[in-house]
């Protein structure tokens, strides 16, 4: 298993996102398994941090893709449509060719979006190197929810066409959810080259801990049960909706508090909802906290809530954060969108409510908040599942067969 693997990423650590966390743990687990991985992130990360051209994280070298002239810098920094996308693809392709000529690799493993995939595919084919493409999400759907494009727009259709082009020409394709694989089959992708590697978690980092009483006192939590949301505040995560739902839950007589840990584009709407409802006494917005302290905030939350809205993206893509909560043995309450249903078995490893339905949310939340025994049972079973099926050490082994298949399929 000493294959030399070049991972091609949109962005990587120290950028903090679900995307970068999956990459970090996956690549580190591959290294410990005996692979020889290295990673390259695209030029969009270079825009944010032009001085960091190379770093080493957990024994793996991460490199950047710098601009190669004024035109590429202008096209990318000024966000010129089409020209920007073309510049990203060209820069990634040329950077990969440069790297593999100086330090040969056995396989190129690109991760969505399609711009990373297309640049990596072109480089792989020019050098006769097997190529694996991994889909984390269909990024055009995220752009729709962020009001950047419409589903009938040229850019939406172009993004889908580019994705299909890369997928159909890859030697092997990985999807992080079964729903993504089903969508690829619908788009006439050869099922024989499709593989499933779900999100995982570092079970050694995320293991059950006692309540951090010092933090609880600092936050003034008292003895009321605490709902927690820990994650990025994208619109599709539904956190502003959650604020209103928790206010209604309390109005109906269920005692609780809500902690919101994280930041993102929906923060203004979340703050506005708290102000409008005069909910500051029982809802605290803590913003982003240091990653190495995140377990402390999990420890003071009795129930972790994942209130995703039902849109195309959330029906297809599995979130990462619930797995952290499961590894910690926490009770989970989530909306019944497809991405969460793939992680949570109702009444066994958590509870689900009908997405965007306040009445159902209040009913299920009341059960969890008022029954400590139920919380313990669900949390214990959730951790058992994670230890058995979602440990990155276990999931990384799936790439042995995936890479073997890609090597066999090269040129077919």
Q: What role is predicted for each listed range?
A:
Residues 179, 200:
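Carbohydrate-associated surface elements
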Residues 1-61:
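N-terminal subdomain of nucleotide-sugar transferases
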Residues 346-347, 351-358, 367-373:
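Conserved acidic donor-binding segment of nucleotide-sugar-dependent glycosyltransferases
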Residues 104-107, 171, 298-315, 330-331:
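Acidic donor-binding loop of glycosyltransferase active sites
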Residues 360, 367, 374-389, 398-401, ...:
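A short, well-ordered alpha-helix in the C-terminal region of glycosyltransferases
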Residues 306, 324-327, 331-334, 344:
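Short hydrophobic beta-strand element within catalytic cores of glycosyltransferases
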Residues 261, 268-295:
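Nucleotide-activated donor-binding/catalytic signature segment of Leloir-type glycosyltransferases, i.e.
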Residues 6-8, 221-246:
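Conserved donor-binding/catalytic core segment of Leloir-type glycosyltransferases
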């Amino acid at each position: 298993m000493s294959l030399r693997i070049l991972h091609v990423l949109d962005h990587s650590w120290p950028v903090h996102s679900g995307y970068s966390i999956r990459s970090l743990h996956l690549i580190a687990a591959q290294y410990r398994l005996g692979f020889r991985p290295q990673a390259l992130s695209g030029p969009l990360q270079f825009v944010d941090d032009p001085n960091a051209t190379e770093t080493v994280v957990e024994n793996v070298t991460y490199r950047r893709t710098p601009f190669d002239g004024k035109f590429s810098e202008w096209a990318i920094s000024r966000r010129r449509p089409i020209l920007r996308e073309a510049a990203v693809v060209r820069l990634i392709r040329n950077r990969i060719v440069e790297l593999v000529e100086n330090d040969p690799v056995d396989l190129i493993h690109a991760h969505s979006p399609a711009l990373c995939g297309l640049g990596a595919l072109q480089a792989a084919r020019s050098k006769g190197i097997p190529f694996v493409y991994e889909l984390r999400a269909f990024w055009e759907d995220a752009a729709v929810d962020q009001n950047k494009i419409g589903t009938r727009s040229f850019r939406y259709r172009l993004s889908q066409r580019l994705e299909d082009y890369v997928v159909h020409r890859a030697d092997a394709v990985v999807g992080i959810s079964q729903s993504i694989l089903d969508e690829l089959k619908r788009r006439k992708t050869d099922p024989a080259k499709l593989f499933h590697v779900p999100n995982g978690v570092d079970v050694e980092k995320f293991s059950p801990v006692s309540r951090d009483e010092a933090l609880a006192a600092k936050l003034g939590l008292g003895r009321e049960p605490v709902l927690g949301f820990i994650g990025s505040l994208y619109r599709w995560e539904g956190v502003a909706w959650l604020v209103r739902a928790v206010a209604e839950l309390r109005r109906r007589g269920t005692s609780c508090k809500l902690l919101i840990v994280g930041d993102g584009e929906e923060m203004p709407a979340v703050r506005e909802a708290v102000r409008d409802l005069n909910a500051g006494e029982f809802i605290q917005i803590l913003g982003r906290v240091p990653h190495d302290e995140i377990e402390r905030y999990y420890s003071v939350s009795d129930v972790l809530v994942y209130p995703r809205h039902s849109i195309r993206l959330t029906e297809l893509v599995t979130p990462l954060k619930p797995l952290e909560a499961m590894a910690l043995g926490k009770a989970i309450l989530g909306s019944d969108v497809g991405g969460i249903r793939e992680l949570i078995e109702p009444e066994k490893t958590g509870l689900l409510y009908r997405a965007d339905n306040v009445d159902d949310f209040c009913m299920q939340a009341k059960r969890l908040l008022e029954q400590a025994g139920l919380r313990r049972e669900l949390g214990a079973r959730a951790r058992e599942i994670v230890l058995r099926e979602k440990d990155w050490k276990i999931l990384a082994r799936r790439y042995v067969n995936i890479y073997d298949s890609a090597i066999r399929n090269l040129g077919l």
